[in-house]
């Protein structure tokens, strides 16, 4: 992209504005997570899952409204594959009885349908707790491995900058899931596919950040007399074309998945869309500026020690 071929944008000079912007997003995310929380899927709170054929025509919304009074709780209803629907119910009890009520209700309310249960699954509370714990450990473990990897490849300030950026990305994405749940026409429940999306976001954001860090390290050896802030700004600008092209093409694919992938993948693709946008932003305005602040503080301490 020629518009970024000789880019010389003052990203570093505007980092304080970026701090304010990120701070507002993080504050909103924390407030929403504390007050509204997250809507957990049956993977993490237990329940039943049914894949039903021959009942797609009425639509997910109509089926959900018909089943809610019968089941005593609002089920999650999504289109599944080419012809089936997926029904998830956060309920305990006899799965055969719940299945019977679902099938009978659909037949009575929508006579034109011929519902047949293709597959059933049940997630017990203990197994759901194990899955929840495993999801938390997987994200924290990924962050720890990333910290050690960058520590070995660069230095601890770069490691901290990368991990801060990743926490920033995951927290804001989680906050949006909490804030927007119930306001969007698709489910934003946290299940195993969403955890996979978060791990993908972590990897994608890290990739952008490492590219910038690698260029910073290269330019630190070439421009030894330049102030570190100028080196960082030059590094961000020279990798900007690659960052925008990679993010733009990936985002295009994920948007297509969001539009045409069906309701089952809508929450997953929404998480990726948010993560790619926030991750691209953080690789420019969060990760590298954190390194600048840490090095500036270290230099200030050295000057203070020398003055004494």
Swiss-Prot record:
<dbReference type="GO" id="GO:0006605">
    <property type="term" value="P:protein targeting"/>
</dbReference>
<keyword id="KW-0997">Cell inner membrane</keyword>
<dbReference type="GO" id="GO:0015450">
    <property type="term" value="F:protein-transporting ATPase activity"/>
</dbReference>
<dbReference type="InterPro" id="IPR022645">
    <property type="entry name" value="SecD/SecF_bac"/>
</dbReference>
<keyword id="KW-1003">Cell membrane</keyword>
<keyword id="KW-0813">Transport</keyword>
<dbReference type="InterPro" id="IPR022813">
    <property type="entry name" value="SecD/SecF_arch_bac"/>
</dbReference>
<dbReference type="GO" id="GO:0065002">
    <property type="term" value="P:intracellular protein transmembrane transport"/>
</dbReference>
<feature type="transmembrane region" description="Helical">
    <location>
        <begin position="134"/>
        <end position="154"/>
    </location>
</feature>
<dbReference type="InterPro" id="IPR055344">
    <property type="entry name" value="SecD_SecF_C_bact"/>
</dbReference>
<feature type="transmembrane region" description="Helical">
    <location>
        <begin position="244"/>
        <end position="264"/>
    </location>
</feature>
<keyword id="KW-0472">Membrane</keyword>
<keyword id="KW-0811">Translocation</keyword>
<feature type="transmembrane region" description="Helical">
    <location>
        <begin position="18"/>
        <end position="38"/>
    </location>
</feature>
<comment type="similarity">
    <text>Belongs to the SecD/SecF family. SecF subfamily.</text>
</comment>
<keyword id="KW-0812">Transmembrane</keyword>
<keyword id="KW-0653">Protein transport</keyword>
<dbReference type="Pfam" id="PF02355">
    <property type="entry name" value="SecD_SecF_C"/>
</dbReference>
<feature type="transmembrane region" description="Helical">
    <location>
        <begin position="160"/>
        <end position="180"/>
    </location>
</feature>
<comment type="function">
    <text>Part of the Sec protein translocase complex. Interacts with the SecYEG preprotein conducting channel. SecDF uses the proton motive force (PMF) to complete protein translocation after the ATP-dependent function of SecA.</text>
</comment>
<dbReference type="GO" id="GO:0005886">
    <property type="term" value="C:plasma membrane"/>
</dbReference>
<protein>
    <recommendedName>
        <fullName>Protein translocase subunit SecF</fullName>
    </recommendedName>
</protein>
<dbReference type="Pfam" id="PF07549">
    <property type="entry name" value="Sec_GG"/>
</dbReference>
<feature type="transmembrane region" description="Helical">
    <location>
        <begin position="193"/>
        <end position="213"/>
    </location>
</feature>
<feature type="transmembrane region" description="Helical">
    <location>
        <begin position="272"/>
        <end position="292"/>
    </location>
</feature>
<dbReference type="InterPro" id="IPR022646">
    <property type="entry name" value="SecD/SecF_CS"/>
</dbReference>
<dbReference type="GO" id="GO:0043952">
    <property type="term" value="P:protein transport by the Sec complex"/>
</dbReference>
<dbReference type="InterPro" id="IPR005665">
    <property type="entry name" value="SecF_bac"/>
</dbReference>
<keyword id="KW-1133">Transmembrane helix</keyword>
<dbReference type="InterPro" id="IPR048634">
    <property type="entry name" value="SecD_SecF_C"/>
</dbReference>
<comment type="subunit">
    <text>Forms a complex with SecD. Part of the essential Sec protein translocation apparatus which comprises SecA, SecYEG and auxiliary proteins SecDF. Other proteins may also be involved.</text>
</comment>
